Amino acid sequence: MFVAESKIIRQLAKSGSCIILGRCGDFVLRDFSKHYSFFICADDDFRTERGRTEYDGKTLQEIKTEDQKRADYYEYYTGERWGQPEKYSLSINASKIPLDKAADLIIRYVELLQA
């Protein structure tokens, strides 16, 4: 499945602008010159509240279990550790900035690099 997904991701990127969430997109597109990757993290208090309000009452433990699955998937297919700041164009702590402002920050970041 990873090989097929990677092929589709690369085809999408070659055909124009796109946004890839997850699926090791940072790794798959690492050789694309106009590739930007972002990592969003948050502290446990923020994640607990967001799990409660936005994800049908998910507990912090459930969220951390999902994160571990993401990390395992990423490491299995890339041989690298998931979430390492140096792998991303920009990392944002969502506990410190409202999500709409984080989105604005990402847009501005890309605009600055494309200028």
Feature map (PLM): residue ranges:
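Glycine-rich phosphate-binding loop used to anchor ATP phosphates in small-molecule kinases
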Residues: 1-30
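Short, amphipathic alpha-helical "lid/cap" segments that border enzyme active or binding sites
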Residues: 6, 99-107
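Conserved acidic residues
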Residues: 16-17, 35, 89
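Conserved nucleotide-binding/hydrolysis micro-motifs of P-loop NTPases
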Residues: 25-26, 41-47, 97-98
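Small-molecule kinase domains that catalyze NTP-dependent phosphoryl transfer to phosphate-bearing small molecules
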Residues: 27, 57-100
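Conserved phosphate-donor/acceptor-positioning beta-strand/loop module used by diverse small-molecule
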Residues: 31-65
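Short, charged, intrinsically disordered terminal tails
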Residues: 108-115
